Amino acid sequence: MLVRRLFQPSTLHWAWRTTALNHPLGRHQGGLRWTHSGGRSYRAVIFDTGGVLVPSPGTVAVGWEVQNHVPSGTIVKAFIRGGDSGPWIRFIKGEITTEHFLEEFGRLCSEIAKTSVPVSSYFSLLTSEQVTKQFPVMTQAISQIRAKGLQTAVLTNNFHLSSGESFLPLDRKQFDVVVESCLEGICKPDPRIFQLCLQRLSLQPSEAIFLDDLGSNLKVAASLGIHTIKVDRPETAVKELEALLGFPLHLGVPNTRPVRKTMAIPQDALEKYLKGLLGTHSTGPMELLQFDHGQSNPTYYIRLADRQLVLRKKPSGTLLPSAHAIEREFRIMKALANAGVPVPTVLDLCEDSSIIGTPFYLMEYCPGIIYKDPSLPGLEPSRREAIYTAMNQVLCRIHSVDLQATSLDSFGKQGDYIPRQVQTWTKQYRAAETSSIPAMERLIQWLPLHLPRQQRTTLVHGDFRLDNLIFHPEKAEVLAVLDWELSTLGDPFADVAYSCLAYYLPSSFPILRGFRDQDVTKLGIPTVEEYFRMYCLNMGIPPIDNWNFYMAFSFFRVAAILQGVYKRSLTGQASSATAQQSGKLTESMAELAWDFATKEGFRVFKEMPATKTLSRSYHAWAGPRSPRTPKGVRGHSTVAAASPSHEAKGGLVISPEGLSPAVRKLYEQLVQFIEQKVYPLEPELQRHQASADRWSPSPLIEDLKEKAKAEGLWNLFLPLETDPEKKYGAGLTNVEYAHLCEVMGMSLYASEIFNCSAPDTGNMEILVRYGTEEQKARWLVPLLEGRIRSCFAMTEPQVASSDASNIEASIKEEDGCYVINGHKWWTSGILDPRCKLCVFMGKTDPQAPRHQQQSMLLVPMDSPGITVIRPLSVFGLEDPPGGHGEVRFKDVRVPKENILLGPGRGFEIAQGRLGPGRIHHCMRLIGYSERALALMKTRVMSRTAFGKPLVEQGTILADIARSRVEIEQARLLVLKAAHLMDVAGNKTAALDIAMIKMVVPSMAYHVIDRAIQAFGAAGLSSDYPLAQFFGWARALRFADGPDEVHQLTVAKMELKNQSRMQEPAVPRV
């Protein structure tokens, strides 16, 4: 078994030993012999395992590498590396333990990939139940071979598990002989292991057939005289094996199996009923089989005399309301018989439960092909394209049925299909609920609030998928559409979205297989965009732009269905053997639905350009809100006369009232979210930060993040100039986001809730600006989606890091990768358990010009050699869960492709990173200051000292006045800098960026200090946010460079600027 078959003969150079086995080949001791029509007789079939009976480990590795961002081919290269002395060969020979193998193999993979490779994850997948299921076609073939009296054997390269047992994911009762490499100490393609297998079968080589998927193994077997079959596809190999043996190896009806005991039905009563219905007087036995697909209604194949039928029944036991409506199936297929939609011929509906225990209906058996794997393995790309085109066309025919002509106009309610469906599936889910699933709870609230405004009404299938279609064996023609139990009158786009489930599911997903991890272009399958355009073109209708809603709804339905299947499996009612797996899948389907919900953009803002249909976005605009003036929003007497558009950035917007209507609504929504959802939870969030669990993410924060996503308040920070296509963010200008950033500064927790917190924002921006497509896929996307966090390693304890050219950390090229050594501190975010990426700055060439010595690397946090020495606190504040760490990097190896922009570009990247970041820091500080002043005003109006209210004390009034003036001055300076960045670029705005960093932290420090003074000792407590505001305001006088550096920059630029008015020269006397 396993990986020998992945290699070509030239890859490994074997030194074959010439010593013979201690025991000579035994001669056959009788037994059955099957003679092929060509005269050759066979007495046994020997099977390899991986790639023959179960999926190949190479195939498993390909998908796993894509999903885990491991360079393609790493696993296979590691299998080959070292030949006989490599860890893999020693492992399959049983010479080393699983733990020893994983340690050596992991180190080898990391060397090959130039990054850390989680081989334990691959090994778990390789040995998991989901990828070790025996191919049904092979199971049937083995059964038929043994029924004819031939022997069967398995000859496998396998290994020991940690438990000490050998890994063989098969029913050993299927085989007369099992030969395992890890038990024998030899492995394929060593000829001795073939000879050993033949000896235990008591056969000559010419009496056996051997199936393997690797030519090197087959070549050795053939040289011994064994007949061989190369396995590329199990189905094709079985046909070749049939031709050699001369008898059929599959059951007469594809996709059927003997009836499971829990699904047995009374055959005598059924046969009597059928003979009465069909007028059949045959005395032969009735043949009854069960179809191996169908999760909802049990489906059976019946052969009686010369009639082939299909029986479909309701499940036994108590059922959910309105579920398993086989009566509707019967009615719709009968009505469609002459309506241009291919359906099986229905014969009778029996509602008498006394016959087989439940109502059922009968239809003619329609021979053909059901493609259960949507990737259509083994077919040519052109054939795959034709099949999906035919699928699309038949869906259009369903949606084009004349409802009146077919008397189906009363088949369901007209209009409001989606609201009714959401309500129905919510009820179905509640009735089958076994435990609370957070994503389902969020969807149940979200879906009714985001319904499509306009819906067409047609006949809808309700469960339209590739595996519910029967195709012609020779051409891409749909012969019949099956499984109509969910059909009704409704929104046709729900059918279209449901038919695209496979595009978003991985190939390893049980029950509903997909091809998300495969290149559909290479397969020949239309992309989801092409499939949707094809549908709209065939129907003659314009495309819709709320595709994400329909996908969210589709996966919500799937989750509800799977929950029902799981509930029935607990009582033995479910019809499929895989039903019990559905309990684990409901949650993942709900999470996938929620992922679409958070990406759904409803085009609320008419001024914003519409996004392209079906294009993926990591920001979702929320639904419209009625305009209002939110409580606590500052007002200014000076209001911009007009709202500048993104295309014409003319005027400086100095207050929220001057924002465009679209952004103004977003601003108001943000204020409302913080006031209603964040402020009330601040005490509890503060308690979490002080608890023993503080280094774990707060569940409240995680819940608020999901709510923020759902309302479109997510990834607002990326400026339009960086992301002009709005692929990753909201497409706001620096000025627009500055106003929103101030609102986020009102709460210490807001930035993380909206995925707008440092250092992630800076790291995401440099990935957008400078990252390769591979770097974006691996790091940017999960950061944007909030699945991981990151840190930034630049500051060092041994040098004055205010001068970036001082850094001593080294980045050296060695053996095709970069090796990092250095000591960093104040590395913000590194303590967060979700931190998976470190953006590291070090020197690649100390001899280069001063600002070309540094480079930036993307360092996976699981790379060997990274040690967090200790957490650092700010005025005693630990800032969990991200914190700030002192870190040592020792011989950390990073692939060369992880460098950003190129060697010597680190200082350039750092400067590009700081511009927008300084706007964000400064506007959040203004938010701190605004809230501190508001708290101060409330406090002094409610407290009395020395016989009169504090508000009447002269010093208090003076402090309030100074604070207001300083806040206004600082805000105008920041907005001016943001405006210059928008209209002239960061370089032109350099002076203003330096000025705001010099002015704003100092301003905030003084304003917050005055508020604390007005509060007295209470201002120092954790009962109010003032102490934390003060601590971070003081710390930000260092972040992005200390005040003195910015003062120096401003002074130098001022002296260089000759355009300022100058005093006339003093005349000499």
Swiss-Prot record:
FAD binds at residues 792-802, 828, 943, 1013, 1044. Pfam families: Acyl-CoA_dh_1 (PF00441), Acyl-CoA_dh_M (PF02770), Acyl-CoA_dh_N (PF02771), APH (PF01636), Hydrolase (PF00702). The modification N6-succinyllysine is found at residues 413, 427, 1052. InterPro entries: ACAD10-like, ACAD10_11_N, Acyl-CoA_Oxase/DH_mid-dom, Acyl-CoA_Oxase/DH_mid-dom_sf, AcylCo_DH-like_C, AcylCo_DH/oxidase_C, AcylCoA_DH/ox_N, AcylCoA_DH/ox_N_sf. The keyword Flavoprotein applies. One of its GO terms (biological process) is carboxylic acid catabolic process. The keyword Oxidoreductase applies. Its EC number is 1.3.99.-. One of its GO terms (molecular function) is flavin adenine dinucleotide binding. Gene3D superfamilies: 3.90.1200.10, Acyl-CoA dehydrogenase/oxidase, N-terminal domain, Butyryl-CoA Dehydrogenase, subunit A, domain 2, Butyryl-CoA Dehydrogenase, subunit A, domain 3, HAD superfamily/HAD-like, Phosphorylase Kinase, domain 1, Putative phosphatase, domain 2. Keywords: Acetylation, FAD, Flavoprotein, Oxidoreductase. GO terms for cellular component: mitochondrion. It catalyses: a 2,3-saturated acyl-CoA + A = a 2,3-dehydroacyl-CoA + AH2. Belongs to the acyl-CoA dehydrogenase family. This is Acyl-CoA dehydrogenase family member 10. It comes from Mus musculus. The gene is Acad10.
